[in-house]
């Protein structure tokens, strides 16, 4: 027994429905199948009872008023009403004609289930058929007569079969067999409605459906695998084509990269020829460290020569973890040139002459403060030109003599006094080391030789002795005025036998002690006597001659004027 049947029985007991009402409720239930013919036949027989008729018709009208999800109540109630009109009492058809408006309203019955199916179409069609039957009296009469004959035949057949078999209950097949033509038609219509409902329901997945689903999945999987293999093959062919194109264009790319590397490499080394006439630097004479490789791939750059004569800097190593090379001895850029190592040639002066054929002797030519050596005059002139200080200066437009070298030679040529070893004449005159005569004819000799056509005799270059850079070389002839030892050391006692010639002392005599009189200060004032101080109302100004007040008229009350004292001796050596 289903749950709906149990619930219906419980309601029947609670509401205390009668036997006729219970049968109508069962025939018009919400079950998915239609009412049985035997049950409808029993209800039709009860319509001849007045009490049962009222109960049956009240329950049918109540079922027709349902709506919504109880659409089966409405449909089965109209099916039962049609059966009762044809096989039941005539009062059934009379009451249905009186309440035809209730049946006509069912033509607009609407209900759509949650699956989207319109279930109200069956109710609307059944309502139209029932209204048409009630309005047509002739058809109603014919249908009623035919249905009653069919019911009688079925009743007789059932009575005969029951008499032959015995008093046993009729089989289910005989109960299900329609007893009349109207009942058969009702059952057929109910079966069609139920079949339509079952056809509209979604089909359940059976074993065949599962097999078809698995087959469809396998086919789709095979198709996907095939497409994947085709795609992989296309990718492989594309990769091979790319690699082949890379190999073909490899040479072109390499040449382009080499051209690009040449653009960013270091420039070519400077030309060996100096455009300003300087000799070519001899790189072999300067020991340099091995050039390190450029970490970015550039060629090694040779270290540039120092134009001031300093040693070439050691190039930085490309290895950041390599220990630094020991630094060489520091070179003073203003000091003397260090002696060249064995096997090294002289370093050329970048500011010197471009004549590289004349050998240079003496100190290294890289020192810019040493005097340039004398060179031969191509016009036959004197190899040395006179200078104002008596030293030999090299001529030429491409070399500039050192402005301090003449003072060095002047310092070495100063005469010394023969009285003592440490005595020097402060204002001693400059002694020319070499002064050509006023009537030197060497230039004329060269000019005559050129006019005749013979080459002028080459002058022998005069070697320049090496000089030592001292503070006196910067001070020149005024170096004797500054005591350099007293500036950096504490002065000691003056020896008793030492004497110096001071031109500022009176008479130019030697000074045996510290000078008392300063020639650059005014003379000290004369000492006044007591009488002069007593007579002077204004104290004398230091450094001014004493003043005396003399009476205009020579009054008798004033004492006679004192004779002036002797004038102070003048000790200024510059005054005559």
Swiss-Prot record:
Q: Where is the composition biased (Pro residues)?
A: 297-314, 454-468, 557-570
Identify the gene encoding this protein: EPN1
Task: Tell me which PANTHER family the record gives.
Answer: EPSIN-1 (PTHR12276:SF48), EPSIN/ENT-RELATED (PTHR12276)
Function comment: Binds to membranes enriched in phosphatidylinositol 4,5-bisphosphate (PtdIns(4,5)P2). Modifies membrane curvature and facilitates the formation of clathrin-coated invaginations. Regulates receptor-mediated endocytosis.
Residues annotated with Phosphothreonine modification: 460, 464, 470, 494
Region spans: 3 X 3 AA repeats of N-P-F: 502-574
Q: Which GO terms describe its molecular function?
A: clathrin binding; molecular sequestering activity; phospholipid binding
Residue ranges of the motif [DE]-X(1,2)-F-X-X-[FL]-X-X-X-R motif: 402-411
| GO-annotated cellular components | clathrin vesicle coat; clathrin-coated pit; cytosol; endosome; nucleus; plasma membrane
Q: How is it modified after translation?
A: Phosphorylated on serine and/or threonine residues in mitotic cells. Phosphorylation reduces interaction with REPS2, AP-2 and the membrane fraction. Depolarization of synaptosomes results in dephosphorylation.
Q: Where does a 1,2-diacyl-sn-glycero-3-phospho-(1D-myo-inositol-4,5-bisphosphate) bind?
A: 8, 11, 25, 30, 63, 73
What name has this protein been given in UniProt? Epsin-1
Domain UIM span(s) in chain numbering: 183-202, 208-227, 233-252
Q: What UniProt keywords are attached to this protein's entry?
A: Cell membrane, Coated pit, Cytoplasm, Endocytosis, Lipid-binding, Membrane, Methylation, Nucleus, Phosphoprotein, Repeat, Ubl conjugation
Q: How does it sit in the membrane?
A: Peripheral membrane protein
The record's section on Gene3D superfamilies has: 1.25.40.90
State the domain notes: The NPF repeat domain is involved in EPS15 binding.
* Family membership: Belongs to the epsin family.
Where in the cell is the protein located?
Cytoplasm; Cell membrane; Nucleus; Membrane, Clathrin-coated pit
Low complexity: which segments have biased composition? 157-167, 265-296, 332-368
PTM sites of type Phosphoserine: 382, 419-420, 435, 447, 454, 473
**Subunit (UniProt):** Monomer. Binds clathrin, ZBTB16/ZNF145 and ITSN1. Binds ubiquitinated proteins. Binds AP2A1 and AP2A2. Interacts with RALBP1 in a complex also containing NUMB and TFAP2A during interphase and mitosis. Interacts with AP2B1. Interacts with UBQLN2. Interacts with REPS2; the interaction is direct. Interacts with EPS15; the interaction is direct. Interacts with ENTREP1.
Q: Name a single GO biological process.
A: Notch signaling pathway
Query: In the record, which positions carry Omega-N-methylarginine?
Result: 534
């Amino acid at each position: 027994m289903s749950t709906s049947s149990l619930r219906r029985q419980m309601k029947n007991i609670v509401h205390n429905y009668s036997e006729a009402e219970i049968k109508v409720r069962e025939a018009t239930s919400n079950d998915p199948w239609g009412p049985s013919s035997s049950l409808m036949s029993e209800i039709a027989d009860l319509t001849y009872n007045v009490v049962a008729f009222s109960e049956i018709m009240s329950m049918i009208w109540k079922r027709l008023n349902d709506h919504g999800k109880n659409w089966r109540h409405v449909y089965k109630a109209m099916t039962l009403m049609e059966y009762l009109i044809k096989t039941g009492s005539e009062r059934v058809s009379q009451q249905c004609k009186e309440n035809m408006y209730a049946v006509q309203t069912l033509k607009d019955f609407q209900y759509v289930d949650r699956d989207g199916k319109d279930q109200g179409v069956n109710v609307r069609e059944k309502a139209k058929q029932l209204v048409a039957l009630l309005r047509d009296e002739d058809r109603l009469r014919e249908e009623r007569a035919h249905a009653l004959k069919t019911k009688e035949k079925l009743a007789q057949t059932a009575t005969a079969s029951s008499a032959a078999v015995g008093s046993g209950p009729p089989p289910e097949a005989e109960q299900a067999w329609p007893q009349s033509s109207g009942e058969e038609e009702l059952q057929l219509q109910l079966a069609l409605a139920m079949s339509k409902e079952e056809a509209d329901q979604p089909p359940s997945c059976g074993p065949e459906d599962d097999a078809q689903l698995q087959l469809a999945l396998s086919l789709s999987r095979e198709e996907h695998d095939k497409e994947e293999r085709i795609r992989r093959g296309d990718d492989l062919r594309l990769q091979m084509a790319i690699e082949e194109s890379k190999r073909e264009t490899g040479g072109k790319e390499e040449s382009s990269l080499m051209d690009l590397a040449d653009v960013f490499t270091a420039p070519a080394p400077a030309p060996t020829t100096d455009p300003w006439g300087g000799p070519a630097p001899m790189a072999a004479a300067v020991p340099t460290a091995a050039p390190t490789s450029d970490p970015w791939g550039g060629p090694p750059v040779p270290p540039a020569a120092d134009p001031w004569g300093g040693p070439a800097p050691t190039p930085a190593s490309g290895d950041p973890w390599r220990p630094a090379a020991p630094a060489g001895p520091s070179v003073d850029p203003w000091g003397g040139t260090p002696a060249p190592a064995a096997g090294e040639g002289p370093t050329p002066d970048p500011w010197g002459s471009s004549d590289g054929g004349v050998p240079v002797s003496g100190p290294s030519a890289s020192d810019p403060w040493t005097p340039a050596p004398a060179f031969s005059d191509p016009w036959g002139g004197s190899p040395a030109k006179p200078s104002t200080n008596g030293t030999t200066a090299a001529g030429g437009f491409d070399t500039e003599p050192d402005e301090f070298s003449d003072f060095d030679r002047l310092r070495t040529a100063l005469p010394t006094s023969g009285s003592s070893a440490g005595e020097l004449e402060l204002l001693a005159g400059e002694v020319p080391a070499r002064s050509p005569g006023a009537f030197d004819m060497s230039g004329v000799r060269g000019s005559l030789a050129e006019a005749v056509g013979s080459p002028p005799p080459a002058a022998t270059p005069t070697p320049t002795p090496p000089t030592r850079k001292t503070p006196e070389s910067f001070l020149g002839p005024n170096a004797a005025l500054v005591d350099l030892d007293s500036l950096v050391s504490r002065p000691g006692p003056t020896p008793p036998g030492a004497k110096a010639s001071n031109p500022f002392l009176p008479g130019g005599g030697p000074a045996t002690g510290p000078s008392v009189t300063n020639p650059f200060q005014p003379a000290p004032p004369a000492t006044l006597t007591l009488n002069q101080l007593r007579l002077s109302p204004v104290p004398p100004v230091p450094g001014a001659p004493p003043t005396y007040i003399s009476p205009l008229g020579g009054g008798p009350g004033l004492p006679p004027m004192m004779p002036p004292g002797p004038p102070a001796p003048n000790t200024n050596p510059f005054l005559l």
